[in-house]
Amino acid sequence: MNNVKRIQQELRRRGLDGVLVTDEKNQRYASGFPITDGAVVVGLEKSWLITDSRYIEAAEAAVDGSLTEVVLYDREHPLTGIIRSLCSGMARLAAEDKKLSHAGYLGYEKALGRELLPAGDMFETLRASKSEDEIACMIEAQRISEKALETVLHIIKPGMTERQVAAELVYNMLKNGSEGNSFDPIVVTGSKTSLPHGVPGDKVIQSGDFVTMDFGSIKHGYCSDMTRTVAVGSASEEMRNVYDTVQRAQLAGVAAAR
């Protein structure tokens, strides 16, 4: 999956010659490869993924060479020097002003010896509309989460702690193909279920408790997010009434949003 052409179209629409991509998530969006150090430069006709020796082999195998060239930086060929060379013919070069600190933005201007234009909401605008490939990744991430939950529902029992249930969710998401957690999983039980973003701890699950789980998987950089509440053992009439009331409210909200 490569979004270079979409970015190039947006550059033309904005009257820009190129953009320096420094945010890790947007670097992956632009190149199709996740890096933690380096940069991506997208010009009107070509793009470059600049990385170090730790990632060079994997990057070359992963990116579409017809659209993106992988460039190695090291001590003899520093990152800013390579960026300066690649962007020398770009009169109007933008940078991610919303992702860089003010000091970072000025630092790049000083290192490159030129003024940078603000990219503004370029990537937010592009990423708000998902391609079929992106939607497929999100669906797969959700499938992984649902499969993990299905397994964990057969594991949860009185005597387990919130932390143990969270560990089972994480393990089963990874086992089913997740690249990691969309966010730190939330697992709370009993009185702690009133905490929307409670942190799983050593609280022990009792028979008759509600357990709320909020978790998500990642596939090709795209995340899922799901929340489920289940009763362990049996649910009292009051618990069923509360559960049904919340579900009706949720369904009404979904219907109104369509």
Question: What residues fall within each predicted segment?
Answer:
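Active-site neighborhoods and metal-handling regions in enzymes and metal-associated proteins
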Residues: 1-258
